[in-house]
Curated annotation (Swiss-Prot):
Residues 28-47 bind DNA. One of its GO terms (biological process) is negative regulation of DNA-templated transcription. This is Probable transcriptional regulator SauR. SMART domains: HTH_ICLR. Residues 83-252 form the IclR-ED domain. InterPro entries: GAF-like_dom_sf, HTH_MetabolicPath_Reg, Tscrpt_reg_IclR_C, Tscrpt_reg_IclR_N, WH-like_DNA-bd_sf, WH_DNA-bd_sf. May regulate transcription of the sauSTU operon. GO terms for molecular function: DNA binding; DNA-binding transcription factor activity. Residues 6-68 form the HTH iclR-type domain. Keywords: DNA-binding, Transcription, Transcription regulation.
Length: 252
């Protein structure tokens, strides 16, 4: 690769880094200021990134963000990276103690994606594989990850969600969801009380990279035929201990 090609690749990667670290879509001017390159150069790189589906524009066409292709790439890397075995071991220890399915999840676009999952041995269970996606507004992990987004990004994302009813208990009103998210953030605990599937409950705790941002969530789900919500809440301290261990794998 020539020095010119190498420099162009580094600049393109730097722009992707800036977009991925931002709280929301960025304007051309904001990207120029962050990367300290001429406006024409940044605009040319952005057009190249758009043409390869690595960057997309928002509805107003004035702001840029990482595309769904980049988000899926990030998920794939995390699922296959070196610390994946350590993450799986942490989930396995939780399942051994609780006896129910445990998940490691993260936000990907307007969905929750499973980075890893250890299934219970009980025959009555939900069969989902790592890489599976579930809604944000009616899952314990989804509400938790939404709750820890910066306010503007959270408002924008909630406004874009269809808020479809998955059961009689699903929150389908944006105002009610925002109230739930405020409570979720305060208690640092996501709760799914039959909101995604009748008869299935779940709780989730954040994996915190710093005091205000959750990089992932750990959740346990169980049929109500085997456990009440009060009984499930009794395992929250175990989930929090697991989250403290899990965050170390995101720093490697």
């Amino acid at each position: 690769m020539s020095n010119h090609s190498n420099a162009a690749a580094v600049r393109a990667f730097r722009i992707l880094e800036i977009l991925s670290a931002a709280d929301g879509p960025l304007s051309l001017a904001a990207i120029v200021q962050a990367i300290e390159l001429p406006k024409q150069t940044v605009h040319r790189i952005l057009k190249q990134l758009e043409s390869t589906w690595l960057v997309s524009r928002t509805a107003g066409n004035r702001h840029y963000e990482c595309s769904s292709r980049v988000r899926q790439l990030a998920v794939n890397v995390l699922m296959q990276a070196g610390p994946a075995a350590a993450r799986h071991a942490i989930l396995q220890q939780l399942v051994d103690k609780i006896g129910e399915t445990c998940n490691l999840t993260m936000l990907s676009g307007d969905d929750v994606v499973y980075l890893d999952r250890v299934e219970t041995q009980w025959p009555l269970r939900m069969h989902l594989q790592p890489g599976s996606r579930v809604p944000l507004h009616c899952t314990a992990s989804g509400k938790l990850l939404l709750a820890f987004l910066p306010s503007a990004q959270r408002q924008r994302l909630v406004a874009s969600l269809p808020l479809r009813a998955h059961s009689a208990h699903t929150i389908t009103n944006a105002e009610a969801l925002h109230a739930e998210l405020a409570e979720t953030r305060q208690r640092r605990l996501g709760v799914n009380n039959q909101e995604n599937l009748e008869g299935m409950i779940a709780v989730a705790v954040p994996v915190m990279r710093n005091r205000s941002r959750a990089c992932a969530a750990i959740a346990v789900q169980v049929p109500m035929a085997r456990m009440t919500m009060d009984q499930l809440m009794g395992f929250v301290p175990d989930l929090r201990l697991a989250a403290d261990e899990m965050v170390k794998t995101f720093c490697e």
